[in-house]
Amino acid sequence: MSKKKETDSYLSSDIKKSKDFKIISNLLKINDAVIVSHYYTTPDIQAITEATGGKVADSLEMAKFGKNHKAKTLLVAGVRFMGETAKILNPEKIVLMPTLKAECSLDLSCPEKEFNKFCDNHPDRTIVVYANTSAAIKARAHWIVTSSIAIDLIDYLDRLGEKIIWAPDKHLGRYIQKQTGADILIWNGTCIVHDEFKSQSLLNMKKIYPKSAILAHPESPENVLNLADFIGSTSQLIQAAKSINQKTIIIATDKGIFFKMQQACPDKILIEAPTSGEGLTCLSCARCPWMKMNNINRIIKSLTNKKKHNEINIPHDLQKKALKPLMRMLKFSQKVI
């Protein structure tokens, strides 16, 4: 269940009286920087981000915010592909991360060499890749999407008669295919967090909370999605939690989302969806291990380190290639959001 008291402590104005806030605020001014954080980072990072004028958001809104903000330096708290996306969109800006070792299981599941071979074997197909991919994979794609616009884009391409390659998340790919009926070849990747949600355990929890609603991210397995009252991206799940009638909500996504979700609906009871069957040990336990690598001390070190060991750099040619499908994504998102 959500730790409401802990969340409330981060929501209070006391955060601005903390030593960390004063240090980070000063470093942000010195570096002409702003923090952009994902919903899956820890509550203290999300609170510091908002208190210093930064943005906590999903991948799409992170990209938009970083591109439109006047700061010369972006501190991206999330996983590596998010920092790369920020750099692709803002080659003139310095892009820092708390650590460059924060990977993503979806990104790792789609190696460049293997994916290029897969695409070469299907030259007649339009390549659509999830934002959770490396700069090299993005550069190979025709389109890039986040989960918030994936169905809209695939439906659009399907109406144009396009046959599609989708990578890397197989669960999201199957969900999109089911929703649109599009002709899609799906790469076999998964998210370490969402892949662990189990339908039987979810059914057992539903028996304990029979009046609850289930909200699920589409990176979850199909049998979990079949039990959900609402399926959507992180930002869409937060909106659903606000509008849904039930007071008790079971959440099948990374528990980092609870911070902003509890802000949005403080009267709701949020419960973590189970991540394993009885007697089994979970690997992620509804918390991305790489997102947890982001912490306040690393943010301070990244902003302090003048050698910029945690700076994202992308070769110019690769940046130019990856920028094209990213800009298509941003332009398309303006039409559907």
Swiss-Prot record:
Binding annotation for [4Fe-4S] cluster: 104, 191, 288
Role according to the record: Catalyzes the condensation of iminoaspartate with dihydroxyacetone phosphate to form quinolinate.
Residues that hold iminosuccinate according to the record: 38, 59, 130-132, 147, 217-219, 234
Subcellular location: Cytoplasm
Protein family: Belongs to the quinolinate synthase family. Type 1 subfamily.
UniProt-listed Pfam families: NadA (PF02445)
PANTHER family per UniProt: QUINOLINATE SYNTHASE, CHLOROPLASTIC (PTHR30573:SF0), QUINOLINATE SYNTHETASE A (PTHR30573)
GO biological process: 'de novo' NAD biosynthetic process from L-aspartate
Catalyzed reaction equations: iminosuccinate + dihydroxyacetone phosphate = quinolinate + phosphate + 2 H2O + H(+)
Keywords, in A-Z order: 4Fe-4S, Cytoplasm, Iron, Iron-sulfur, Metal-binding, Pyridine nucleotide biosynthesis, Transferase
Cofactor note as given: Binds 1 [4Fe-4S] cluster per subunit.
HAMAP family: NadA_type1
Entry protein name: Quinolinate synthase
InterPro entries: NadA, NadA_sf, Quinolinate_synth_A_type1
Signal sequence, renumbered to the chain: none
